A protein has these predicted regions:
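Cytosolic regulatory/linker segments at or just downstream of nucleotide-handling modules
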Residues: 217-220, 237-241, 248
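Conserved small/polar residues in nucleotide/adenosyl-binding loops
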Residues: 272-276
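Short beta-strand/loop element within the Bergerat-fold HATPase_c
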Residues: 167-173
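Glycine-rich/acidic phosphate-handling loop/turn and adjacent ATP-lid/helix
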Residues: 176-209
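Conserved glycine-/histidine-rich ATP-lid loop and adjacent helix of the Bergerat-fold HATPase_c
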Residues: 227-232
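Active-site helix-to-loop segments that bind/position phosphate- or nucleotide-bearing substrates
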Residues: 1-162, 170, 183-196, 219, ...
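Conserved alpha/beta core segments of nucleic-acid transaction machinery
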Residues: 243-271
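Structural motif
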Residues: 174-176, 245
Length: 276
């Protein structure tokens, strides 16, 4: 879907500032990457954000390029149901403590800018243990990595023709990621990992180029492993139908410790079952 060429859209419809921000991140992460030498048009073509049309033989944005780098008012011309919504609900007495919507007109409203704005909001309350490498403090943790994966996964696997859009909710004790569209691998395979079948393959490529997202299908299992290591309640994957939606719920509640007496009773029950 996201490989389609938008033959009637000029390349100038993409947001220049978003493109430059993305390129700067790419250069910083991979200074020797050969794409760094390309001009903007060649670069967009190389990452899949633009392609030569078979109709007029000119360069036009792809669907992925429009979603990643376009302005919201241009994106909705091609994806009428497109909507990105971040809701922060940390105080129960206030409806929203923070909100970011793609349709506000206060920013570009594209996927690239949404990702970085929302990620910064998600991690601002995460406690970072003091750790240094070669004298430099490391502010990244497995929890940061898991949240990057969860947010990218939500965007990469969304059906942008589906209704109700993408919703990310940050609450006091959990974060919920919702995207339109069913899980193409099924929720059990998502947990198991090993199979990657993203709905938007070019979007995945563009995130991978800046070191975001796991292409090998191990991203969701890594999230589960991180939550296990933290002692938090296991993440929940929900599938809803009519309309199709996929939810990933990450709770920060600690697992309830099993009492010693309960463990002994469980062992007795298992032993008795085997004897009978």
């Amino acid at each position: 879907m996201d490989m389609d060429v938008l033959d009637d859209v000029p390349i100038s419809d993409l947001n220049y500032e978003t493109i430059q921000g993305y390129r700067n991140r790419h250069r910083a992460l991979k200074p020797a990457h050969p794409f760094g030498r390309l001009n903007d048009s060649e670069y967009l073509r190389s990452i899949g954000a633009a392609a030569i049309s078979n109709i007029d033989k000119c360069l036009h944005p792809t669907a992925a390029g429009m979603l990643m780098f376009g302005d919201e008012y241009n994106i909705v011309r091609h994806f009428p149901e497109y909507f990105l919504d971040y809701r922060e609900i940390l105080d129960p007495t206030i409806r929203w403590t923070d909100r970011l919507q793609s349709s506000s007109g206060e920013w570009s409203g594209n996927i690239c800018d949404f990702y970085f704005r929302v990620y910064n909001k998600l991690v601002k309350d995460i406690k970072v243990p003091f750790k240094t490498i070669d004298g430099n403090r490391i502010d990244d943790t497995p929890v940061h990595e898991a949240l990057r994966e969860a947010l990218a996964n939500c965007l990469i696997n969304a059906d942008f023709y589906g209704v109700r859009g993408i919703v990310v909710r940050k609450e006091a004790d959990r974060i919920v990621f919702e995207n339109p569209g069913y899980s193409r691998t099924g929720k059990q395979q998502m947990k198991k990992g090993g199979i990657s079948d993203p709905r938007n393959k070019v979007l995945m490529k563009m995130f991978n180029l800046i070191n975001i997202g796991e292409r090998a299908g191990s991203g969701v299992p890594n999230i589960f492993n991180t939550w296990e290591d933290q002692g938090w309640v296991e993440p929940v994957i929900e599938e809803q139908f009519d309309p199709d939606r996929t939810l990933l719920i990450l709770s920060f509640d600690k697992k309830q410790a099993i009492k010693t007496s309960d463990k002994k009773q469980a062992i007795k029950t298992v032993s008795y079952t085997h004897l009978t």
